[in-house]
Amino acid sequence: MIKNLYFIVINLVVGFCLNSIIAQEGPKIIEILQAGGSTQDQQKFPGANILVKKDNIRVHLLHEGALIKSNISYFYPKKNFFKANGNVIFTQGDTLKITCDYIEYDGTKKLAIAWGKVLLERTDMNLKTDTLYLDRLKSKAYYNTFGTILDEQTKLTSKRGIYFMDLKKYRFISDVKIDNPEYQITSQQLDYFTESDKAFFYGKTSIKGEEYDIYCEKGSYDTKLQKGSFQKNAIIFYNNKEIRGDSLYFENERDYAAATNNISIIDTLNKSVINGHYGEIFKTRDSAIITQKAMAINIVDQDSLFIHADTLIATGPSEKRILRGYYDVRIFKSDLRGKSDSLHLNESSGLIKMLKIPLSRKENQIFTESQKNARNPVLWFGKSQMSGNKIFLTSNMKNQKLDSLKIIGNSWIIEKDSLSETGFNQIKGGLLDGLFEDGELVEIDITKNTEVIYYMYSDEENELIGIDKTTCSSLKMITKDNQIVDITFFVTPDGQLLPEKDLPINERKLKGFYWREDERPRNITDLFSEKDKRYQIKPIENIKTPEPFLKKSVN
């Protein structure tokens, strides 16, 4: 029979606790602060004091700063353990509050198990789950039966989770989802710090904002400021572009992203790519800058055009993109190679400008014509070397094929003679215009002070007839398979065909001749300078993978 022994129980328990503390060192005994009544049922609950609510007096148990309130509690003094149910409230100071239907508590191990509509309340957020484990010695609370975290704006769910009370940190595992009005996050594993609003990701993770999408398998993210860094297969989907790299950085407020090591910026609309080892992207200005072995890949003639420079800058929307290359520009295509100090590519008009850095006053004074020509932009078509002060290449944007070529100022075409060991066919003039058909250079017009040296052979026996040395106002040249097959001179050409022996060796090259075959890229690797090839990728400090969720199961 239940008796109202409230005050008697308190006195007995307090005395018992004092004697126990004096008698032995170790875990403190659970204290009974109040109860509406007490009884025992040794058959069903051997060794238990059954504490119950009566007349609005609920059961209050205290253990080392933790207060547990309930309607009924089965207290086992010898085990320093109790089970409680009925509107259970567990509080630890003013920092932690748990409400649930049932709770078990081991005072020796300081372990609690709460289940049934569990709610863990903090000043900054609340956790709801079906079953919650609380380890007071390690200041941890964890669940593995699906949980929901709520704050003022954000809802977070996961199958498993652990809360590090001292660190004010949550770790969520398996099917992690964060739903915020401004972004959504899904992850395999996520660590979240409540004071800094910062999240760390481990495993496949995606972040979807209003104007961006991010994927990574390691990373960190400030959920308040919407900025973070991302590693391991990281991708930012941003303004019709994909940004990839070993390490990515992103700031939503600044419309800014950066990438380090093995980066690629892919324009998904025009299918162009820029690679390198460092890049910055500015969404508001619709621009990107890439350095460290930077290389752009564009489609021309249904073929890849590779462009390398110390620095590449892309600006404008996809349909009007401008690509600029600065310093030591080199280009490679299956039927075309090139080199210049700088490059300007307009993807809406299909115009490529290859330019040089102007010579200084001193260089203009002391350089020979050959030395000046060595600094000019240069192209190689087949066996032909073409150079000049400026080179313009234009593509037909409808069929994506090369359409025309223009070389402005000091235009040169040099071709190693196919039979002579030392001879070069040369054409020099002020302006060069070339036409393409189906991507092949078929016609060239050269005007203004045109000079020619050309080795002539018999059609049948391929015997050298002589060397043609001519000056004229202009000429037209027909090519096939990137080789000169016919030349027509215009406006009172002045020249003669001389036997090889009658033309001195020092007169077999036009003034300013400079053969640059050793600069010609043979493959994509040749696009990079020796400095580029020596470049070492700087290691990135990886985010450390955390320890397993639980090393041991909870008993």
Feature annotation, model-predicted:
Residues M1-K28, N555:
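Bacterial Sec-dependent N-terminal signal peptides
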